[in-house]
């Protein structure tokens, strides 16, 4: 892999002499400095390495130049270039040594697996072998120092934590539902405080995303509650009815409480997840995949239990008529006075039951898509790139929604029934029977169209805002 880079930078010796090292860097620098102005800029670095067969991810060339550019002239002169490579090489050697558990000078799949486990990331044997295969040059299924250095010399990742972030499942993609397994943070991220910055960035991204797709979310709830075989509501007619009743601004009814509940739910879920992992683990806090899934599901149930009254208010505010409630507190006051405390937990059972199929299918589909990508395309790099990660996350979340949607519909109808005049208060099982008898199986999927329509814009908005927030909060890639 990358034969020209090996020719310029690497020798057969594991310990390059300082003068040989400098000479190799000088030859590489001359090759990259196409316009011969004595410095290598982002464009030259990217183009030159691509010509040598070294593919770089988005923004990696810029990050290398920014890291090494001490005089801030938007380019690396030879001194800056060689200094960056030498310092980066030292960091890579430390990482390699931390991986090489038995100190035999080679890293195998088991050592990669163990190192990631030490950082709180569980990896299957198959996944570890695939990542190893993507770096292994000589086909021995072990890595020596030269192979490791060759693969990561022009990758701005400086330590194992950054390298493993390629495939860490992130919950930044907010598609409006909160049933996912919480995000996983390494020990370094927890001790440096990076975790709260990532949660804050994700929270802001979710708020903007939900606001941007609120009209479609209101349409989904509207169709879940009011649409039936005898009262078919199309997207166009539904929007016309809502605008006629309350104006364009009415399309955002219920969005305020939907955004406000992000902060407490995220905080409770994260704290509960950490505690459940400790309770379920048998070996000093290191949890297996099934334990992680259980901890995530329990954390989701805990968070939902704590903020569920806000879920009920969101549904009521979304469906309200003009003048019915003056705001969130007025809504809470009227529900409490007319229906009592129990009303704040209507639909709680189907909501909790929906966590298992949603989270389980979300994780299973994500892992399947990830393994498919690794087995077919991870020949030169284990880095999937932004589009692949977004695609995997979107598809897996959508599949999870599809599986749990009937329970979500039952929950919404139970939340709304008490506020609808003349509606009969029934249990979850009776409501399912009633829908099946009157509308058939597809009656459980009323409102699925606007729900799916909001997935792509929601994911896109989440990602763009999250990246801006990462930059603003100084979160490293």
UniProtKB/Swiss-Prot annotation:
Source superkingdom: Eukaryota
Presence of keyword Transport: yes
Mitochondrial matrix topological domain: 217-253, 311-346, 408-446
Organism annotation: Danio rerio (Zebrafish)
Organism classification: Eukaryota, Metazoa, Chordata, Craniata, Vertebrata
Stretches the record annotates as Linker region: 160-169
Protein name stated in the entry: Mitochondrial adenyl nucleotide antiporter SLC25A24
Binding annotation for Ca(2+) 1: 33, 35, 37, 39, 44
Record's keyword annotation contains Zinc: no
Record membrane topology: Multi-pass membrane protein
One Gene Ontology biological process: cellular response to calcium ion
Ligand binding (Ca(2+) 4): 136, 138, 140, 142, 147
SUPFAM superfamilies attached to this UniProt entry: EF-hand, Mitochondrial carrier
């Amino acid at each position: 892999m990358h034969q020209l880079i090996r020719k310029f930078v690497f020798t057969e010796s594991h310990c390059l002499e300082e003068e040989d090292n400098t000479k190799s860097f000088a030859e590489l620098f001359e090759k990259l400095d196409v316009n011969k102005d004595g410095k290598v800029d982002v464009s030259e670095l990217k183009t030159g390495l691509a010509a040598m067969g070294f593919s770089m991810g988005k923004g990696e060339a810029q990050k290398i130049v920014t890291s090494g550019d001490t005089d801030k002239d938007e380019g690396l002169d030879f001194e800056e270039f060689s200094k960056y490579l030498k310092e980066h090489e030292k960091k890579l050697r430390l990482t390699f040594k931390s991986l090489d558990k038995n100190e035999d000078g080679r890293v195998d799949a088991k050592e990669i697996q163990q190192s990631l486990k030490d950082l709180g990331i569980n990896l299957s044997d198959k996944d570890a072998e695939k990542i190893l295969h993507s770096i292994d040059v000589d086909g021995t299924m072990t890595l020596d120092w030269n192979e490791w250095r060759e693969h990561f010399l022009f990758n701005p990742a400086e330590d194992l934590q950054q390298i493993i972030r390629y495939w860490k499942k992130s919950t930044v993609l907010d598609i409006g539902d909160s049933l996912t397994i919480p995000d996983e943070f390494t020990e370094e991220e927890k001790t440096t405080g990076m975790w709260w910055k990532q949660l804050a960035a994700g929270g802001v991204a979710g708020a903007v995303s939900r606001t941007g797709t609120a009209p479609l979310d209101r349409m989904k709830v509207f169709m879940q509650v009011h649409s039936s075989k005898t009262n078919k509501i199309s997207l166009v007619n539904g929007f016309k009815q809502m605008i006629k009743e309350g104006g364009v601004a009415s399309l955002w009814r219920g969005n305020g409480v939907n955004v406000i509940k992000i902060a407490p739910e995220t905080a409770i879920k994260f704290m509960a997840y950490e505690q459940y992992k400790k309770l379920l683990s048998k070996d000093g806090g290191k949890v297996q995949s099934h334990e992680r899934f259980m901890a995530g599901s329990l954390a989701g149930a805990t968070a939902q239990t704590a903020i569920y009254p806000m879920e009920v208010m969101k549904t009521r505010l979304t469906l309200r008529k003009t003048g019915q409630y003056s705001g969130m507190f007025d809504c809470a006051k009227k529900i409490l006075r007319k229906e009592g405390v129990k009303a704040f937990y209507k639909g709680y059972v189907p909501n909790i039951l929906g966590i298992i199929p949603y989270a389980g299918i979300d994780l299973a589909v994500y892992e399947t898509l990830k393994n498919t990508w690794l087995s077919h395309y991870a020949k030169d790099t284990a880095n999937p790139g932004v589009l692949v990660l977004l695609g995997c996350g979107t598809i897996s979340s959508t599949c999870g929604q599809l599986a749990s949607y009937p329970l979500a519909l039952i929950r919404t109808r139970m939340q709304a029934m008490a506020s609808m005049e003349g509606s009969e208060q029934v249990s979850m099982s009776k409501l399912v029977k009633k829908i099946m008898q009157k509308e058939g199986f597809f009656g459980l999927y009323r409102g699925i169209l606007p729900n799916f329509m909001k997935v792509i814009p929601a994911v896109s908005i989440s990602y763009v805002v999250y990246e801006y927030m990462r930059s603003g909060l100084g979160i490293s890639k």
